[in-house]
Every structure is written in C-alpha cells, then in structure tokens.
A protein has these predicted regions:
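Short hydrophobic/aromatic-rich motifs at helix boundaries and adjacent loops
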Residues: 1-3, 45-52, 98-99, 122-126
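Non-catalytic substrate-recognition/targeting regions of SAM-dependent transferases
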Residues: 1-17
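Short, glycine- and charge-enriched coil/turn segments that flank and shape catalytic ligand pockets
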Residues: 1-5, 37, 103-106
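Conserved SAM/SAH cofactor-binding pocket of Class I
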Residues: 14, 18-96
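S-adenosylmethionine
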Residues: 68-179
Length: 180
C-alpha cells in the first residue's frame, strides 16, 4: 500500500460502495484532498459507508451518514465497526429532502458534505447540501455520468456554489464545490 494511505475494510453486502467503481474512486480521491483532521463530514447516500469511513481514517473528528435504504445504514454501521471508527460515525435512515426529523438529526455544520449518487438525486440535493455546509466547506459530489455533468453544474451554481474542481474518470464526473 502506498505510504500515507490506509486500508478501508468493507463488507458491502448488496449495497453500493466497494471502492472499485470509478465514481467511488473519484470521491475517495476528493476525500483525501479536502478532509482535514478534526473535520465534521456528512455523507448523503452513504451506501456501504466507504466515504465517511475513509474520512474518519484520514482524521475527521466525526462523520454522519444517511441513506434511504435501511439495509445500507445497517451495513455502513457494521463497516464502521470493522474499521474501528464506530464511536465517531452515526448513521441514519431517511430522505434528507423530505424528512423533517432526519433534518433535525443532521443539524449542524460540516466542513465536507459528500454525495456519490446519480445526477437525478444530486440535482435536488444541492440545496440541502448547502444548508449543512460550514463556511469555507466543500461539497464533494460524484456519480454523475458525463452526459449529465452540465445539469449538475447548473444546479450547483443555482444553489450558490462555485465549482472549484472538476475531475473525470471512465465517463464519470466529480465536482468539488464551495458556497459563494
């Protein structure tokens, strides 16, 4: 393993997020770039929890994940335990755009907000992501097929974000964006 890197141990079950898909790799590289020791991280659509767990292993103080799939929340919690970060990782089930109780649980500001989901979900999620972002924080998003990249970029801009980095791999796009 390259120096300075750490392994993330996973049992994804039937949940997305093993680290082998191009979108997950793009987001993991973004986590390496933008997460700093002591950060609070919010992972919207946490899946297996790989992104939040990686952030914790890189020094984030706390990570919170949420997913609409109860199985994903269970798998993410198990994976946090495999990696020894379960005490710093909370996982919730629900839709951040329509669940007031979940919105209260997620309340607070995060230095990094993650979303590795498809464009049709990211687009309406950009407003919520901005509400959780701390000043100077970064919204890292991937799962965007290149033919939908412009749509996501426009949604980010409409919701007060400036795209600070665009990365592409295998027909997928990832954005790092910050609030204006």
């Amino acid at each position: 393993m390259p120096e300075g890197r750490r392994a993330v141990y996973l049992n994804p079950g039937l949940i997305f997020g093993t680290g082998s898909h191009g979108t997950t790799r793009l987001c993991l590289e973004g986590v390496e770039r933008y997460v700093r020791p002591g950060d609070r991280v919010l992972d919207l659509g946490t899946g297996s929890g790989i992104l939040a767990i990686a952030a914790l292993l890189l020094g984030a103080e706390q990570a919170v994940g949420c997913d609409i799939d109860p199985k994903a929340a269970r798998v993410a919690a198990e994976n946090a335990s495999y990696n020894g970060v379960e005490g710093r990782f909370q996982v919730y089930t629900g839709d951040v755009n329509g669940d007031a109780e979940l919105q209260q649980k997620l309340a607070g500001r995060y230095q990094v907000v993650l979303a590795n989901i498809i464009a049709d979900i990211i687009i309406p999620l950009t407003a919520a992501a901005g509400n959780y972002l701390a000043p100077g924080g970064t919204f890292l998003t991937s799962g965007i097929i290149d033919s939908r990249a412009r749509d996501v970029a426009e949604a980010l801009e409409r919701n007060g974000f400036t795209i600070v980095e665009t990365r592409e791999r295998e027909g997928w796009v990832s954005y790092a964006a910050q609030k204006k």
